[in-house]
Amino acid sequence: MTDQVFGKVSKVVCVGAGYVGGPTCAMIAHKCPHITVTVVDMNTAKIAEWNSDKLPIYEPGLDEIVFAARGRNLFFSSDIPKAIAEADLIFISVNTPTKMYGRGKGMAPDLKYVESVSRTIAQYAGGPKIVVEKSTVPVKAAESIGCILREAQKNNENLKFQVLSNPEFLAEGTAMKDLANPDRVLIGGESSPEGLQAVAELVRIYENWVPRNRIITTNTWSSELSKLVANAFLAQRISSINSISAVCEATGAEISEVAHAVGYDTRIGSKFLQASVGFGGSCFQKDVLSLVYLCESLNLPQVADYWQGVININNWQRRRFADKIIAELFNTVTDKKIAIFGFAFKKNTGDTRESSAIHVIKHLMEEHAKLSVYDPKVQKSQMLNDLASVTSAQDVERLITVESDPYAAARGAHAIVVLTEWDEFVELNYSQIHNDMQHPAAIFDGRLILDQKALREIGFRTFAIGTSPDQAYNLFGTAGY
């Protein structure tokens, strides 16, 4: 019988205090009061925010859980060596951005932070540790982590490591609900006795609130690939319905009606069939590109091309929407004030990573439009930094104004462009807004949340993704613009 290498987990550490690490560990602390959970990060300012009354990320329900558990069995610290030394189980939850240089530029994930954390664990471990990939990583990343940790074992017989894959399946804006009631928890590990022990310990943590039949165990590689494939399938759904939105605009069909009819087929289902200006966020594009790169590396060009098409449609949809705005505003937006409603990549989050708003705004800035931006959760500094990263700081200063309320953003504007589906945008007094705008006033609904008929009755010209144009000012006259 194999000796028990790993004892019962009583101390959990997460390296990385971002959108995944913070909420995940808050939920573990909430559901497992007998386990001490510590979130560590090199960014001392971020840790200070986690220890303050204003948390560094906005997520419905997060504040209540953090404030209840913090100081009891949930802690935030920048003392990484101490936390690693004391931990039984360590989550790696650091950023894995797309590489912007060298081999794999623009496609492959950059694993430098994962490697750095792995070396830090090897340096300060001191005893047996279960190491868990929480970051989205390419297939075989656990093998790289394990290689680093095994080298450390050669010099210290007290060190024993097992590397598991436990990808997150959170949707920002509903992360706490997703954590409290997940569709599934996926854990990948080795089939060795030690690997099975490590998997069992992580299963035991989740069993405190997740039914055992929702906890799936696989080999490590299947777990890593499943995460990429899940996000690729979701992104594919969005690109699929967005491609059909262009057909609807050209034919007089309504995308909402088409999606509703198609979604009634139980083999297809209705989720992720909401046409829009395009998907954003930290995961979808990054993970699809990672899958494309993997397929190219495996000499599977047809598969790589198939998934690259998902990204191509998303980029085309953003460009198409921006071109539509320009065309409908008499083919010029130069020096025209345009109000932008929404900057986050989706509602109920302040996250702006890969937001479609950034891309649409960039295209309009290239035409020298003057843009007045409002978002209820995104900080002004975040907006300006994001835009300066895709254009120039001078153009941002010259063309961008950030407002603290939507009425101010729309005052004197030629058009309103809805780029995030915030609930508050549905409830605004559009009669008042219309009175304060340039006429003819237009609304471009990139999220299909507004009542187009009611807006037309007020006097707006309306244009929505996947619907026939209202008044035919379009100089191009086709869905492709």
From Swiss-Prot:
Q: Describe the disruption phenotype.
A: RNAi-mediated knockdown causes a reduction in the size of cortical granules during the first meiotic division.
What GO cellular component is one of the record's annotations?
cytoplasm
The enzyme's E.C. designation: 1.1.1.22
**What are the binding positions for NAD(+) in this chain?**
16-21, 41, 46, 94-98, 135-136, 172, 283-286, 353
Catalytic center residues:
C283
Enzyme class, first EC level, given as a word: oxidoreductase
On whether Oxidoreductase is a keyword of this UniProt record, the answer is yes
Expression across tissues: Expressed in the vulva and in oocytes.
Q: In which pathway does it act?
A: Nucleotide-sugar biosynthesis; UDP-alpha-D-glucuronate biosynthesis; UDP-alpha-D-glucuronate from UDP-alpha-D-glucose: step 1/1
Key word Lipid metabolism present: no
Question: Binding positions for substrate?
Answer: 168-172, 227-231, 267, 274-280, 345-346, 447
Biological process terms from the Gene Ontology for this record are: egg-laying behavior; embryo development ending in birth or egg hatching; glycosaminoglycan biosynthetic process; morphogenesis of an epithelium; reproductive process; UDP-glucuronate biosynthetic process; vulval development
Catalytic activity of the protein: UDP-alpha-D-glucose + 2 NAD(+) + H2O = UDP-alpha-D-glucuronate + 2 NADH + 3 H(+)
Q: What keywords sit in the KW lines?
A: NAD, Oxidoreductase
InterPro entries tied to this protein: 6-PGluconate_DH-like_C_sf, NAD(P)-bd_dom_sf, UDP-Glc/GDP-Man, UDP-Glc/GDP-Man_DH_C, UDP-Glc/GDP-Man_DH_C_sf, UDP-Glc/GDP-Man_DH_dimer, UDP-Glc/GDP-Man_DH_N, UDPglc_DH_euk
What are the GO MF terms of this UniProt record? identical protein binding; NAD binding; UDP-glucose 6-dehydrogenase activity
Q: Which family does it belong to?
A: Belongs to the UDP-glucose/GDP-mannose dehydrogenase family.
Q: What does this protein do?
A: Involved in the biosynthesis of glycosaminoglycans; hyaluronan, chondroitin sulfate, and heparan sulfate.
This protein is called UDP-glucose 6-dehydrogenase
**UniProt organism field:** Caenorhabditis elegans
- What lineage is on file? Eukaryota, Metazoa, Ecdysozoa, Nematoda, Chromadorea
